[in-house]
Amino acid sequence: MALALVSVAPLVSMRRSLFSSPYELKSIDKTIPNLVMCRKRMLGRPSIRVSSTASVSNDDGVRRRVGDYRYNHWDEDLIDSLATSYEAPSYLKRADTLVEAIKDRFNSMGVDDGERMSPLTDLYQRLWMVDSVERLGIDRHFQNEIKSALDYVFSYWKEKGIGRGRQSAVTDLNSTALGLRTLRLHGYPVSSDVLENFKDHNGQFTCSGIQTEGEIRGVLNLFRASLIAFPGEKVMEEAEIFSTMYLKHALQKIAVSSLSQEIEYLLEYGWHTNPPRLEARMYMEVFPQDTIYEQKLVELAKVEFNIFHSLQKRELQSLTRWWKHYGFPQLSFTRHIHVEYYTFGSCIATDPKQSAFRLCFAKMSYFVTVLDDIYDTYGTMEELELFTAAIKRWDPSVVDCLPEYMKGVYMAVYDTVNEMAKEAEKVQGRDTLNYVRQAWELYIDAYMPEAKWISSGYLPTFQEYLDNSKISFGTRITILQPILTLGEPLPHEILQEIDFPAKFNDLISVILRLKGDTRCYKADRARGEEASSVSCYMKDNAGITEEDAIHCINDMVNNLLKELNWELLKPDSNVPISCRKAAFDICRIFHHGYKYRDGYGDATIEVKNLVKRTVLEPVPL
C-alpha cells in the first residue's frame, strides 16, 4: 500500500504542470560568433562522456560514442524490383467502375439481390457499409455517401441506443456499439452513457454465455467503441475490461476463422497502435464475400491497394535518391531507416494526392533520427554548439565551419525545409518558412540541455525531463510541415491550435516520449544516456522498482490517450479534421513502433512486417 501511494502522488502533481513549458519562441539570432571557430581547434576537445558499455570511435582523434545500429535493411535493388503493372489503364478503369457501383449501392440503399432493405435492419446495414469502406481503406471515394448514411442513423439515435433497424422493438448491442464508435468518430454528439443500458441489475456488462457469432461480433464492436473513450468515461473503461476478457475467452473456444483472425488482430493493435493501411490489408483477407456487393468492396480495396503500391515505388525511389545525394549512407553512426519512415507516412496518408505529405514526413522524421544520434551519441559538445548556431543562422555559407560529417546533414535540412516551405506556400497562400525556422530553432535548442546532462552525468527530475522532451523528441518537426501540405488552408491563429505549444501537440509529444522510454531506456543507458522518464521517475520516488515505474508510466500514457481522443474529436476545434487526424495518425504510427520494443534502434519483426505488408508486397487479386 505504501508503494502505491508513492507511485500515485507524483502523478497528480505532474498532471498539473505537464503541459506548461519554460520555452518561448525567440527571434532568430543573426550574430553567431561561434561559427568562426576553426575545425582544427575542435580536434583536441573532449567529447561527451563515454559510458563503459558504449562502443567507441576514434575518427580524427576524437573519442566518440556510437550506437549499436545495423545498416539499411532495404537496398536499392529491392526497391527497384517492386512491381508497377497496377498503373496500367485497365486497373484504373476497373477501380472507377467499382467506385460507381458502390456509390449506387450507397445511394439506393434498397436492392440487394432482389430484396429491399428492411426497416428492421436498415440502421445496422448503413453502419456496416460505412465501417466497411473505412476499414478497407477506400472511404475517400464515398464521403458524401458516408455523411448521408450517418445522418440517417443519427436521426434515429436514442438515449437507450438503437436496434438493427428503425422499426426494431429492442435495442441491440452490436448496432449501438458500432453506432457509438462510428458516429463519435464523425463528430456526432453521442454519449457513452448509452452503454449503461446493456448492464444487468448489478451494474455489470452481461452476455448469454452461448457465444454465438452474432454475440461475439457485438462484443467485438463494444471493444472497438471502448477505445474511443474520453477522460472520465468510466463506462468505457468498464466496457474495455469486459470486452477484452470476453474476446480472449472466446478465442479459446471458437475455431480458427476469419472472425478469430479479426479478433486477434484488434486485441493486438487496438486503435492507437493500428496503422490504417495495415488494418486495410488484414481486413481484405478476412472480409466476407458472400454477396456480389461484398465481392465488389473487396475487389476495389485490392485494386486501390495495388495502384497505390505502384506510386509507392516511385516515391521510395525519389526518397532514396535524396538520401544518397546528401551522403547519408556514409554516416555509419546513425540509423538508416528512411524506408521505414516512408512506410509510416504511406500507412497514414493513403490518398495518392498526398505525395508531398508522405515524402515530407519521411524526410523530417529521418532528420529527427539523425540529429538524435548526433546530439545524444556521436557529436562533441563543441560540435553540437556549432551545429545549433548554424541552424539559427540559416545560411548555407556556414557549412564550411562545420565538421565534415555535419555538412551534408546541415545542407539536407536547409534545402529540404526550404523546399517544403515552397510546397506549403502553394496550399497556404503565404510563406511559412520563418514560422518553421522558429520551430527548428526551438527544437535544436532543446537538444543542448540533454547533451549537457549526458556530458555531466546529471539526472533531471521527472518534470524537468518532460518539459524538455516535449520539444527535443521532435514531434513538432515531424508534424508541422507535412500538415501544411495537406490541402487545407491553416491561418496562423488556427495553426496554433494544433502546433506547439497547443495541448494537441504536447499530448502527442509526451505520449511518445513516455512510451518510447519504456522501450529504449536500457539501450540508452548502455550508451551513456542515463536520463529517461523511467530513471527520472525512479529518482523522484526513492525505492520504487523499474517495473513499478514502467507500470505507472503506462498508466499515464493510457490516461493521456483519452485526452488525445478528446482533442481529436472535440466539437469546438477550429482546426480541419483532416489536419487533426493526420497529426493523430502520426502519433498512432510512432506508437505502433514502440508497441513491443524499440522499433527504431533496429528494425524489429513488427516494423519489418509493416514494410513488407504495406509497401513491398502487393495484394493478390
UniProtKB/Swiss-Prot annotation:
Pfam families found in the cross-reference section: Terpene_synth (PF01397), Terpene_synth_C (PF03936)
Residues bound to Mg(2+) 3: D524
Biochemical pathway: Terpene metabolism; oleoresin biosynthesis; Secondary metabolite biosynthesis; terpenoid biosynthesis
GO biological process, one term: diterpenoid biosynthetic process
GO CC aspect terms: chloroplast
Cofactor(s) the protein needs: Mg(2+); Mn(2+)
Keywords per UniProt: Chloroplast, Lyase, Magnesium, Metal-binding, Plastid, Transit peptide
Predominant location category: plastid
Role played: Monoterpene synthase (TPS) involved in the biosynthesis of monoterpene natural products included in conifer oleoresin secretions and volatile emissions; these compounds contribute to biotic and abiotic stress defense against herbivores and pathogens. Catalyzes the conversion of (2E)-geranyl diphosphate (GPP) to (-)-beta-phellandrene.
Domain notes: The Asp-Asp-Xaa-Xaa-Asp/Glu (DDXXD/E) motif is important for the catalytic activity, presumably through binding to Mg(2+).
Name used for this protein in its record: (-)-beta-phellandrene synthase 1, chloroplastic
Organism encoding this protein: Pinus banksiana
UniProt gene name: TPS-(-)Bphell1
